[in-house]
Amino acid sequence: MSAAETGPIASGSAVSTGQRGVSRVLAKLSQSLAGGEFYEAHMMYRTLYFRYTAQKRYQDCLELLFDGAQQLIAKEQESSAADLCLLLVDTLEKRGPQAEDTDNFLWVPRLGALIRGLNSATVERETLIQRTIKWSTALHGQYGHPVLHKLIAHVFWTEGNIESARHHYLLCQDGSLCGRVLIEISQSRGFQGEMDLFLVQAVLQQLSLKDRKTAEDTFTEYTRYHAKLLKHEFPYKEPLVNFLYFLFRLIDAKRVAGFRALRKLYDPSLKRDTSFLKYVAKIGVLYFDEHPEAAHSGPPGLGGMFGDIFNRLMAGFEEDDADDHDTTLRRQNENNELE
């Protein structure tokens, strides 16, 4: 028999042997889980991960790791479960986005459920959250999938980690929900004179992230239902709330002169928080074609993932606008006619 004839036979034999090997490992894996040998089970999951990914059997690998992580979480083996979760994200990255959007989205709630199942004391959980968000940017923009942010926000909120929850709620593109969350935070943690600050910071951040619709939905929910605001419709008693009201309308009208006048008029109020003027400067670049200012390190108090997002926003002023410099100058000349 020629080599050409024996080649396919040899290849088929190797595949068959490999499948038998996987079957044996799966059988031992079930026994280890049933017998409480969780470290051994963890190692076998890793072995199967390497075999499946080497064979590009990504779907089999994903289902195996998801099931394994769930089982280990149920057995309170959270460190091992977190490791499988990280391998699952790694497999999703190796596989890449699929043509079927429904399959891509399937893993957003699944990963959210796994994150929810891990205790906050699990060391690897923060790494898992960051890796999962990074993976989801391939599905939805540079800040990650909004549904994933909502699921993560719920986890932090349930644990009482209000600041981390707030950051993720701001990125979930659900302004009504964000407004309700901010109301609860301000009523439980803020003083009467700070009721407007919670709203203003959130709305300016959302506008800086080019999420105008969510920003206005947040504004509407907060001003309509916050019990301690002195008025619930324009004109408001709080100067900064009026500032936001005017800002939305100037963005829609693209009135550069009006924006500059508004910023000057409310400058004393904006100085109540050092971050506000930096956000307003970014908004000027995004919506009114103003020159970017020098890069900032970001306002104090924005740590973690959202702080990184803010730093990328602010540091990207000059770099992002370099290619569009001539266009910006032309637009500014046109806008000068409005002054």
UniProtKB/Swiss-Prot annotation:
Family statement: Belongs to the GET4 family.
Q: Which GO terms describe its biological process?
A: protein insertion into ER membrane
This chain's protein is named Golgi to ER traffic protein 4 homolog
Reading the lineage from the top rank, the first entry is: Eukaryota
Q: Which GO terms describe its cellular component?
A: BAT3 complex; cytosol
- Disulfide pairs here are none
Quote the function comment for this protein.
May play a role in insertion of tail-anchored proteins into the endoplasmic reticulum membrane.
Among InterPro entries, the record links this protein to: GET4, TPR-like_helical_dom_sf
